[in-house]
Amino acid sequence: MKLSVGEIVLSLDESTLRYQVEAAGIEWKWSDHFCPAILTEKGEIPFTQWKEIRHTEFSCGVGKGIHSTYRNYLGKADSYSFDTIVWVEEVNKTVHFEWIPICEKDLSIQQVRWPGYMEFEEGSKENYTLLNQGQGLLIPNNWAIALEKLSFNGQFLTSGGYMPWFGQVKHGAGYIAIASTPWNGGVYAEHPAGGPYTHVGTWWEPSLGKMDYRRCLEYTFLNNCDYNDLCKVYRNYVKEHGLFTSLEEKATRVPSVNDLIGCSFVHCGIKTNVNPKSDFYDPENPQKNNFITTFAAREKEGENLYQLGVRKMYLHLDGWAEPGYDNHHPDYLPACIEAGGWEGMKSLVDTMHRLGFMFGIHDQYRDYYLDAPTFDPAYATMLPDGTYPQHARWAGGPQTYLCGTQAPYYVRRNFTEILSHGIKLDGTYLDVFTCNEGDECANPLHRMTRKECYEFRKNCFDWLLSKGILSSSEEVSDWSMQSLVFCHYAPYHFMLQAPGTPKDGIPLPLFNLVYHDCVIEPWMMDKLSDTEDLMLYALLNGGAPYLIRDGAYANTDGSFSEGAALEMKENIRRCEVVAGLHEKVAKCEMVKHELLDDTGIKQRTTFSDGTTVTVDFAANHYEIC
């Protein structure tokens, strides 16, 4: 079956159920290795197993396409059934792929794998795939390193998929595939060592046990393009859909956004208290499990940094409350008594402000600790089978997850108490919200879909902003850009791995090509070796610098002990360079990124004010013009 809409020719092979799109004479076809399928607990079920499959050409007021119906699974009339609709929008030639559940009987679905991955077999550096794992990744088809499993299984709106799209370019022709229903979906990708191919496709998962709603992937095809063009397609998309809010707009809402621009970031803590049941508990070295730094000591450190010449700084404080870092959440008050209590904390905050610095705290409204004073399983996230997820990964030991419907209430309760003690917060970091997937809760008293969970998380950010407190979270995610002012970091994936780990592609600032002027991103500044200085990535991305980054967990989340130690004055000097650039370009669009050689050793970014940053990672050299 074949139909045309302008320069788009859409074809369906009715025997294999594979599609082909011809766009301005360039052919994009699903790989012969791809079979549309549903994955269940009992195995994979190809779409061809449905006994009654019909394809009908249709047209409507905005486009035309092919409507397919799948009925009579295993010959049963009253059985699991679904439709697919593939159509071309006439006004912009977007090709929409839609999978729609009709009758959800008899099958317990784990994933739907549709639409298919493209045939992309030529082992050429001119052919490459774009993935949104972390800040972004470009995989040439001839890349020597095999692609590892994606973080969070490639789930959209996690650190494995900051933005819900992927793309491919071959000899100057390309496509971007945008998930317009990203909440229960993700990508899977395969690239063997040396290529010659890269395959990338989409998976959809159930919501609260059922597929429940239409799943949509939108393809835009371009000629004479590169990855910059695909990013700008998505930038226009998020503007059209109301997801884009610039720092300029956020500063109108909360003027202190302007004060944060150009700051160096200091990340440190007060109290560590590792539960003996925690995976992090070290019985051989008990001194590592429990220790306290007083508020007064942190106050003195801030004064020392001022004496060394630091003038713009944001202090992010972990473990400031009595339970200790990652303990008893969401019941995380009062301020740590042994460290000085509310009075000591207020003195620290007041001193930071007297020095012209900004101050914020770490907090957590997802991890729900079983020993929290008000813990009640009735408010935990319930899975569809009635159970609750549990683990003891973090310092606080055994935990489950707080249902996201409850998070805004606890934010309001806790911060009302904090503010009542005269503590003026410039910012607050709500842990994991923009890194981990949204939760789903099957408890009928507070049922919540993943999409709704993101809205509840956003409500927490908005409440903070309403009080003049700048919102922050662990990483960055597409859903949060209306309400997130800054983050802990937005790194390339390799930065979260041990130094020296081979890169599974060329790190690329895909996120910043879309959202640079929407969010403030602090960057790690470690000089890992003579040929790996993370400062160059901070400059390339026009980001803010970390002056001190004392991670709560050693060798976790990019907090590694190895690396060349630099004197503090040298650290300050380096941060001044990065912060100075950030002050200049923070509100500018990153209009262009260039790879100046085949391996990404030399790169350049251009910002909308005309500023260019060129880096050479091998020579540890940068140039700002």
Residue ranges of each PLM-predicted region?
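Carbohydrate-recognition beta-sandwich/jelly-roll modules
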Residues: 2-315, 320, 337-339, 355-358
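Active-site-proximal substrate-binding groove within the catalytic cores of carbohydrate-active enzymes
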Residues: 15, 19-24, 171-173, 181-186, ...
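Generic detector of solvent-exposed, compositionally biased contiguous segments
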Residues: 1-6, 39-54, 391, 503-524
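Short acidic, gly/pro-rich beta-turn/loop elements at beta-sheet edges
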Residues: 13, 31, 78, 107-109, ...
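Short loop/turn segments at secondary-structure transitions that flank enzyme active sites
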Residues: 105, 118, 321, 365-367, ...
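Conserved, mostly hydrophobic/aromatic
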Residues: 7, 99, 305, 352, ...
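Short, surface-exposed, polar/charged, turn-prone segments marking secondary-structure boundaries
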Residues: 31-32, 38-40, 48-49, 342-345, ...
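Aromatic-lined carbohydrate-binding/catalytic grooves of carbohydrate-active enzymes
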Residues: 258-413, 423-428, 434-446
